[in-house]
Amino acid sequence: MALRELKVCLLGDTGVGKSSIVWRFVEDSFDPNINPTIGASFMTKTVQYQNELHKFLIWDTAGQERFRALAPMYYRGSAAAIIVYDITKEETFSTLKNWVKELRQHGPPNIVVAIAGNKCDLIDVREVMERDAKDYADSIHAIFVETSAKNAININELFIEISRRIPSTDANLPSGGKGFKLRRQPSEPKRSCC
């Protein structure tokens, strides 16, 4: 079975639950007292998708303003980006559009974009309507899903949909789909002055 390594970065404001989504996906656990990410953290998980193994190389970036300038370093070369907002905080959805703009300017041209409205278990204090977020995601051709890292809602489904949307690669190429052939150039006849 072929193994593909897929770099995925999580972007979004601080406190939206990026780290909790990663922990739920990788470790199937939830820590309500998880500390904010400083800079970025890295985790991996391999899952089977159709006839391939997809090894997700997950970069969880810090959402604090002081670390925002580092984000392009993490999403360069990414196969996918998950931009997370908190459904209970309208301002996190508003700034999500800035994350998308920055990603479109500095990220790979064919990056798969997913928008995750996290904390969908808190519907009683919802500020962002699901329809508004879905319409925005559709307008930029992004995956859209509402998630709850706390209750394990749509976390695995999010990564399955990313696997589905990432273009397949030629089986003869190394993982990541990037490859080239070396060809020997005919050598010029040797000349001598003597």
Curated annotation (Swiss-Prot):
Changing residue 19 to L: Loss of GTPase activity. The keyword Lipid metabolism does not apply. It comes from the Eukaryota. PROSITE patterns: RAB. Its main location: membrane. Residues 174-194 are annotated as: Disordered. GO terms for biological process: endocytosis; endosome organization; intracellular protein transport; regulation of vesicle size. InterPro entries: P-loop_NTPase, Small_GTP-bd, Small_GTPase. Transmembrane segments: none annotated. Residues 185-194 have a biased composition (Basic and acidic residues). CDD domains: Rab5_related. Pfam families: Ras (PF00071). One of its GO terms (molecular function) is GDP binding. The keyword GTP-binding applies. Interacts directly with ZFYVE20. Binds EEA1. Interacts (in its GTP-bound form) with RABGEF1. Interacts (in its GTP-bound form) with RINL. This is Ras-related protein Rab-22A. The lineage of its organism: Eukaryota, Metazoa, Chordata, Craniata, Vertebrata. The gene is RAB22A.
